[in-house]
Amino acid sequence: MATKVLPLVELKPLLGPRQRLIGIDLGTKTIGLSLSDVERRIATPLETIRRTKFTKDAERLLALADQFDVAAFVIGLPLNMDGSAGPRVQATEAFVRSLSGLTSRPFCYWDERLSTAAVTRDLIAQDASRAKRAAVVDKLAAAFILQGALDRLAWVHETADKDLP
């Protein structure tokens, strides 16, 4: 099965009327997951997978995708600050290639630069303890990533319905 990575704007026609998206924040030790609502307007933190073996990680991710009728995955692409691709981008692309062999669902990349930093800053502002931040930062970062993609999808949909110059 070939890797099916699409630009976000090409995803819209493939989505069923009430299908959801899963957002993924891929780390070396954990995988943060978030879930859209059925109208694809709001991203909610879902869970954090402690990485063990790829097969177990993929099994859990795909089980959640089946459980929530997920149409596609939005995975954070960890670009360098200058926009270039580094080793973490290669690791993310390898993960997507491996996972795409197990599912027919498409993938979309979303620039995740500073997502974890933004979430951590918000948690610190809320006076969350270091332990609490560690427990939730990955799934919150996944929600941050997915919300950005959902907002973009909504904008594309709104502007497509208008006559723009």
From Swiss-Prot:
It comes from the Bacteria. Its EC number is 3.1.-.-. CDD domains: YqgF (cd16964). GO terms for biological process: rRNA 5'-end processing. Gene3D superfamilies: YqgF/RNase H-like domain. It is found in: Cytoplasm. GO terms for cellular component: cytosol. GO terms for molecular function: nuclease activity. Its main location: cytoplasm. InterPro entries: RNaseH-like_sf (IPR012337), YqgF (IPR005227), YqgF/RNaseH-like_dom (IPR006641), YqgF/RNaseH-like_dom_sf (IPR037027). Keywords: Cytoplasm, Hydrolase, Nuclease, Ribosome biogenesis. PANTHER family: POLYNUCLEOTIDYL TRANSFERASE, RIBONUCLEASE H-LIKE SUPERFAMILY PROTEIN. Could be a nuclease involved in processing of the 5'-end of pre-16S rRNA. Belongs to the YqgF nuclease family. This is Putative pre-16S rRNA nuclease. It comes from Beijerinckia indica subsp. indica (strain ATCC 9039 / DSM 1715 / NCIMB 8712).
